[in-house]
Amino acid sequence: MLKLIAISADFDPVHKGHEKLIKEAKKLADEKQKKLVVYLNKGYSANHGPFFVNFEARHDMALALGADEVKSFEGLHHRLVLSYSVPIRLNKMYEDGATDYITSAHISLDEIKNKAQKFVKEGNFVGMPKNYPNRNEIRWYALNEFLGSPLEYHVIPEFNKEKYSGRKIRKSILDNDMVIPKETRKLLPKTTIDILEDEIAAGRIPGQRNWAEIYKRMNTYSRGNLEKIAYLNGNTINEIIKRRVYRDPESIWAVFRRANYGPVMTRLAVSAIEEEVTKKEVMDLMKSYEAKSVIPEGQKVQRVIDRAWYVASE
């Protein structure tokens, strides 16, 4: 099997910080005589929402900057919270032949290792403190350790995260009537600009939710049907039924706020409604990975049921 150097990201879109990561990873791959593979999330982002740029365009952006191959992670982020998808993605890369994983961070690899040890020792990878710097990189490192360190971990210094922010880049384009602003162009490789402009001209950007289907389900589904959908507990279902009718996204965000959902769980719950993801579907998916010893003890199905994260409680 060909040995791989792996990157995992959304790249929505690919900016110059990502370009640096790809170039450094390619250099490492050449030194080790390995192949550089970029793994991109497809369908739904790690933030449980639709992508601004579709998979095919992000695929082309990564190849244009030197990746040897682009693979996809699909079917995860409308079904599972991020901390559950990370070990699944790590395992997939290892099964594909990856020996190394490279990422960028503004803290060193030693700092990442030190902060990760607490979570490895406790076997708890869910409650990563929000004030942790580069907490996603810490989570990936900790879960790699949990899986027996199948991947050698590499870290390069990241660009200014406030400046090279995919969220801010996307917002700047949306706020400028779908024209890439001059200042934003400075943050993007030329190949990304060319692909973005082609996608904008073709009307494929930004990606959108299927709001018509979401409104239909939230307005018409019986209590019994809503109870089958993942990430909706009893209190939330009561609020959904009580607050009907839904005609715009804000009315949907508002009902989840009333049910005390935070932004991340709101996006995941709305994605579950959009794709009609059932509690049983999530349970079966998690059990299939438990059987492969991919899921940490604290994240197994029974623990999730005990915490009532996606099982109706009322």
List each model region and its residues.
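Short, structured active-site "lid" loops
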Residues: 56-67
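Residue-level signal for inorganic ion chemistry
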Residues: 15, 62, 169
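N-terminal catalytic cores of NTP/NDP-binding nucleotidyl/phosphoryl-transfer enzymes
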Residues: 1-55
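Active-site cores that bind ATP or allylic diphosphates and position pyrophosphate for catalysis
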Residues: 49-50, 65-314
